Amino acid sequence: MKRKLRYGLIIGMVFLLAGAIALSQYWRSRDFVERWYYDRTHSQETVSSKEAIQSILAEFERVPYAKLDPDYLRQTASDEAVFRKMLSNKFYYLIPGDEIYRKIVGDFRIRDFLPNDQYFRQHLRNLDDSELYWLVNPKLLYAFLQLQQELAKQGYQSDAFVIYNGYRHPAYNRKIGGASRSRHILGEAVDISIRDINGDGRSTKADKEIVLAILDRTVIGNRGGLGRYPGTMSVHFDVRGRRARWDQQ
């Protein structure tokens, strides 16, 4: 009897795991198709200047924290006292429908700076009729652009990295174990995974050191934070307005 129960539990867990994997693949595929369709129906150029970033952002409505949808505040834990204090003076960009696939810096899109969570999936489920809040400090986008420009200036691949964390609302930040006062919550930080920056066909420590050097000396300097995370290909940088450096992820 115990053996049958154990086998039953194992089979149940296998089905649950398979279902979770299938669901994850569904959303990834849906995201890919929507992005492909957007590119087929819209003409976009690489966003290569601060003025171009400003022009794109100006097209979206800016919503003050006090006027955010109560359901959004509750769903994202942004209404909790500690976060209300952090966010009360912030303005969010209201991104309609498939405009999340709009290029915002280089060839990276607004979508790349958004959390891949239930809130995003609800938006993705009904792109024609939904809008999505995005909190971002434009200075972060300018720093991102400057990183790309410096890489290109020095003869390196300017887009050989992947964004895996941008804006994180409080609930998502808590779910993934982020710091309670993370700069991601304020839309001031981005995490990237380094690829083949120097074009030698490999992704190695040398590639990461190139990016870190440019961020440390030119892009961020004393104006922001830099998470170096030794032993990984990950880098964090932010525009907090003062110098901060750390190694532990």
Sequence positions of predicted segments:
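Solvent-exposed, polar/charged alpha-helical surfaces in well-ordered, non-transmembrane soluble domains
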Residues: 142-145, 149, 209, 213
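Extracytoplasmic cell-surface/polysaccharide-interacting catalytic and binding patches
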Residues: 22-144, 241-249
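N-terminal Sec-pathway targeting helices
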Residues: 1-16
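Catalytic cores and adjacent binding grooves of peptidoglycan-active enzymes
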Residues: 24-31, 181-249
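Extended, low-complexity, intrinsically disordered C-terminal regulatory tails
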Residues: 144-177
